[in-house]
Each structure stands twice: as C-alpha cells, then as structure tokens.
Amino acid sequence: QELDLAVIGEKEILTAAGAASTQRIRETVENEFFLEFMKRLIRNKKTVYLLGQPADAVERLYSFLQDEYEKVKIVAQYAMETCIGDLDAVVNAINMETPDVIFSVLPSPYQEHFLEDNRGKLSARVWYGLGEHYAADEKGHSPLRWMRRIIRRKKLTNRLNEYNNNEK
C-alpha cells in the first residue's frame, strides 16, 4: 500500500532512490522540513498525540518537544507496551483526543504494520514517524537545542544593550 506522502529522513535513502540532489540532502540533514512543520503546527494551534514503544521513548519524545517547542499542544501520549487486549483500544484512545497530528516513535517495522492496519480508523490527519534520531546529531547533541541557545543568547544580548542604552 502506498503512502499519501513520505518525507525521507536519511540521506542514504535519498541516494538509494536516486533523489540525492544537493537541496534534498541539505533539507534532510538539517531537518528543514521538521523545523518548518513544527513552526506551522504551533502557529496554527494544532494538537499532537504521542505514540511509541517503549514507554521511556515516549517520555523522551515528550521531554524533547517540551524543551524545544514549549508552545506545542500535546493532548496525550500512549506507550504501546501498556496496551492490554487488541489494538482497537489504542485507536480509540487516540481518536478520543481528536489530535491533528500523531508523532510516532514506534520501532520499524511495527510502526508500518500498525499504520497499515489502522490507517482508515485513525481520525488524525497526519502521522509523523520520527524514528530514533529525531533529537540528536551523530555526536548526540541536539542541533535544534544548539540553534535555540544561539537565538536566546542574541535576544539576551539585545535586551542588555537596550537596557544599557536606556540607562544612559
């Protein structure tokens, strides 16, 4: 079954698919799509549901989103390992919250199978599979965190300069 839209998150996949233009690789390596997606998600006040396995992966995702995008509206989260019974209970839990977007950190291929089996039942318009490395570069540092620190330093410097100018 084909996806409506797939955003490639690894440059190796682009290369294998023969779509490794300089622009596409830059967009992939620098997470440009994700950054823009998050800006629009927050600006349009869209809601997010977190789904994953194991529970600590869901918690890490929650912490990451709260740290990096404090204005994001997370309506609920669900760790698949807590599911007792069939997966319809998970689908119902998601649909009860009526999220606009589901961020998934389910392992592959479990994520693909879950989505294929339940795609028609989910009310969310967007399923965003983040994978394992959504928050870190190769060295384990978040490029988003680094960028945010630079922006905050610049804002702090501007405020201090403004304060000093007002004091004179």
Language-model-detected regions and their locations in the chain:
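Proline-aspartate-enriched helix->loop->beta-strand connector
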Residues: 94, 98-108, 124
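Short Gly/Thr/Asp-enriched flexible loops that form oxyanion-binding sites at enzyme active sites
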Residues: 62, 112-121
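An alpha-beta-alpha
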Residues: 42-64
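A charged, well-structured terminal subsegment
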Residues: 157-168
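Short, flexible loop segments at boundaries between secondary-structure elements
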Residues: 81-85, 123-156
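Electropositive, gly/pro-rich neighborhoods at or near active sites that engage anionic ligands
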Residues: 1-47
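Short beta-strand elements in bilobed, periplasmic/extracellular small-molecule ligand-binding domains
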Residues: 69-81
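Short glycine-rich anion-binding loops that position phosphate/pyrophosphate groups of nucleotides
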Residues: 12, 106-110, 133
